């Protein structure tokens, strides 16, 4: 009766989604095996109202629960942990008997299992058991008995790791499928491809193959997909049946057997008529981020979606558990720094202030692990700079930046006092001696490249800021991180990367994204040979195969649903290419599978992006994927080092002119940072002016400067500001007789 109440007219006017009646049978099955479990808890799985609804909705649902006496009297007997898992095979169906401890009793249930041998629970080396995770896995085991699961949790909190560990416990092979926004039903089930002779044929997608082979499918990012596309999966999830586009049908095992007996046909004959059985242990785990309460755009958890899965919410780790995880993963991290860092992070996570919460999002567990890895490797490093780097505080809006500084000061994380001294270039040297490279205090062995052609070599004048950035990059590079450089246009991101790879002697593959980049063009490049279309590997695939460094430029221009594909590549080393091949991380997974590309151990990715915000009109790449990469903010050089650099570009240009230019541009940049002018003038423009003056020394300064500023002369306000600033430093652009100001007597 509780369920029918929620499906009635009145509750839909309250804006509550309908209750999934179909899932009740499954829930009753679980409660039958575990009679001591609270009913309210099982209802949360079917109908996760605490994440779905705002405050009013929650109160309404809890009122209904009280009315039907389903609100238990506080005796919460929840499953504690999985005690043991044993494999059993009855007539070719692999199952496992799992013993789960609830309160003081142990209950044994049968669940479907995978085709591999089981690993003992908590045997996986990379997974650290904490109390809440043990409990979550035990609950997932209960749902796994009857239905498919959907894990909901914020980004970077370890959903994928839990799902992987769950699969290992039951001996499943995993088939990860990354979902993106413009995915069609065809991408999920079957795609067209062209045979060499020009015929078109259907190729089954990884999802269909997994259903036939009995794997565990991970649908990652189910909150992104269009709801209509997911409706295709409803039949597969509810009835375990599927009709494909080429006319073949997949049936549930028992129906397939009955059909076989009725028609007295063998398996081969049925396969000729394209009827296939779905493997009995096939299961789906969907991973999603929680819906945003109150917004209309992100309500992906609708009534038709609620019937498909059992929902488990993954809470963020409590402080003690997070310390446990970090300490076991990074054993020699300095204790004092770790305590400060965690108390700071949890304080940010618990505040009600929205700006502080947006900062906390960029300090996920994944990011904290990265910071502690660096601290354990370089213990004298400053914690303040590590946190500001993780949040990219250089490009935060002023409100958020001041909130960050205030919270850091409260947590007694201070700025290093030596940082205020102007560092000298002679302290930081880039030198290559007998096969090792030293940048500042960090040294690395030089790579022995097979392809000398692809090692970049550019004109680069050392200046202190760029060398400091490169030293920082080298630290992370040696820790095995993928790098992300964020900065305004023209500050020399490409130059720094090319110089960095030149010093390390690493070959480079280069790919530039744009607004129309799709997932297909990232992985394949079509070209025409002898009148036939031939698909060649894109630089991305080449870099993965040969172990080169992939430089992804303008990463913020591509739609974020495309760049999400990079996430699985960086994190798990897995990715499906547009022609059906797949990239895998370790060669152990290859045995007997064709169409597999193994990642070369030397493969790295360096991503370049502009800062999010107005004049660049990019997507917020940092917001969606920032916590996967190790981030570095690149800025214009300080006036002193910029002057040094310009002297090298224009040795014959008179010194006073260079000083005028540096001072004027310095002021224009600070105006851009305050938001008075839109376009942040960068080093690139000054260098171009100086190059011009070097080549044509007779031309007047004002006419050369106009090459850069003419674009803004149509906008009168901008023009006023520009002319005033340039006059201040004695660059006579657009001067009229009236602007000559005589000194007073």
List PLM regions with ranges.
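Conserved catalytic/switch belt of AAA+ P-loop NTPases
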Residues: 1, 193-194, 216, 225-292, ...
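Alpha-helical lid/collar subdomain of P-loop NTPases
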Residues: 1-130, 134, 138, 280-283, ...
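Conserved nucleotide-binding/hydrolysis micro-motifs of P-loop NTPases
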Residues: 23, 157, 181-184, 224-225, ...
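Phosphate-binding P-loop
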Residues: 132-133, 140-146, 155, 209-212, ...
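The Walker A (P-loop) glycine that initiates the GxxxxGKT/S ATP-binding motif of P-loop NTPases
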Residues: 153, 220-221, 487, 553-554
């Amino acid at each position: 009766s509780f369920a029918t109440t929620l499906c009635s007219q009145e509750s839909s006017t309250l804006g509550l989604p309908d209750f999934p009646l179909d899932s009740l049978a499954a829930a009753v099955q679980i409660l039958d095996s575990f009679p001591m479990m609270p009913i309210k808890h099982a209802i949360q799985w079917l109908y996760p109202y605490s994440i779905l609804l705002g405050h009013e909705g929650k109160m309404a649902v809890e009122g209904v629960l009280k009315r039907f006496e389903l609100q238990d009297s506080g005796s919460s007997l929840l499953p504690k942990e999985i005690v043991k898992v044993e494999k059993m095979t009855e007539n070719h169906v692999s199952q496992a008997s799992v013993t789960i401890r609830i309160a003081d009793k142990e209950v044994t249930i049968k669940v479907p299992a995978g085709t591999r041998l089981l690993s003992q629970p908590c045997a996986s080396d990379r997974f650290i058991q904490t109390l809440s995770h043990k409990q979550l896995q035990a609950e997932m085991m209960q749902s796994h008995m009857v239905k498919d699961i959907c894990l909901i949790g914020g980004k970077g909190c370890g959903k994928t790791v839990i799902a992987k560990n769950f699969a290992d416990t039951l001996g499943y092979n995993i088939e990860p499928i990354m979902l993106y926004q413009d995915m069609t039903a065809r991408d999920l089930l079957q795609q067209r491809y062209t045979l060499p002779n020009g015929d078109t044929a259907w190729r089954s997608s990884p999802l269909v193959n997994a259903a036939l082979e009995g794997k565990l499918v991970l649908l990652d990012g189910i909150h992104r997909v269009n709801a209509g596309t997911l409706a295709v999966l409803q039949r597969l999830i509810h009835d375990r049946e599927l009709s494909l586009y080429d006319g073949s049908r997949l049936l549930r095992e028992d129906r397939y057997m009955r059909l076989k007996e009725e028609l007295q046909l063998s398996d081969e004959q049925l396969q000729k008529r394209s009827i296939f059985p779905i493997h009995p242990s096939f299961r789906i785990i969907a991973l999603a981020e929680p819906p945003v309460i109150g917004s209309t755009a992100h309500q992906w958890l609708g009534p038709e979606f609620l019937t498909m899965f059992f929902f488990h919410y993954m809470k963020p780790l409590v402080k003690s558990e997070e310390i446990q995880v970090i300490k076991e993963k990074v054993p020699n991290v300095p204790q004092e720094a770790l305590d400060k860092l965690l108390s700071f992070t949890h304080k940010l996570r618990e505040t009600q202030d929205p700006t502080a919460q947006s900062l906390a999002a960029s300090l996920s567990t994944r990011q904290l692990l990265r910071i502690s890895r660096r601290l354990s490797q370089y213990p004298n490093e400053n914690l303040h700079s590590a946190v500001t780097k993780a949040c990219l505080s250089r490009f935060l809006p002023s409100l958020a930046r001041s909130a960050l500084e205030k919270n850091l000061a409260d947590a007694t994380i201070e700025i290093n006092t030596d940082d205020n001294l102007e560092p000298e270039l002679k302290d930081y040297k880039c030198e290559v001696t007998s096969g090792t490279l030293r940048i500042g205090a960090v040294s690395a062995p030089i790579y022995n490249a097979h392809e000398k052609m692809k090692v970049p070599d550019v004109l680069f004048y050392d200046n202190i800021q760029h060398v400091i950035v490169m030293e920082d990059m080298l630290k992370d590079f040696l820790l095995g991180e993928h790098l992300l450089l964020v900065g305004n246009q023209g500050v020399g991101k490409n130059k720094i990367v090319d110089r960095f790879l030149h010093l390390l002697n690493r070959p480079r593959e280069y790919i530039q994204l744009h607004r129309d980049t799709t997932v297909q063009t990232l992985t394949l490049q079509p070209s025409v040979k002898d009148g036939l279309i031939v698909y060649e590997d894109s630089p991305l695939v080449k870099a993965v195969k040969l172990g080169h460094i992939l430089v992804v430029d303008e990463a913020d221009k591509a739609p974020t649903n495309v760049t999400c594909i990079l996430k699985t590549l960086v994190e798990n080393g897995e990715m499906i290419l547009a022609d059906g091949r797949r990239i895998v991380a370790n060669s152990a997974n290859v045995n007997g599978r064709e169409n597999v590309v193994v990642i070369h151990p030397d493969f790295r990715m360096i991503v370049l992006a502009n800062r999010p915000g107005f004049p660049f009109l990019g997507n917020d790449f940092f917001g969606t994927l920032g916590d996967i990469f190790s981030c570095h903010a690149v800025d214009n050089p300080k006036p002193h080092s910029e002057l040094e650099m310009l002297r090298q570009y224009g040795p014959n240009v008179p010194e006073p002119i260079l000083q005028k230019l540096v001072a004027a541009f310095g002021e224009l940049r600070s105006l851009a940072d305050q938001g008075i002018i839109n376009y942040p003038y960068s080093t690139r423009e000054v260098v171009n002016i100086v190059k011009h003056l070097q080549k044509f020394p007779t031309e007047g300064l004002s006419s050369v400067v106009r090459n850069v500023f003419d674009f803004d002369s149509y906008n009168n306000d901008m023009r006023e500001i520009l002319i005033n600033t340039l006059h201040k430093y004695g660059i006579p652009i657009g001067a009229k007789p009236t602007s000559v100001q005589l000194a007073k007597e």
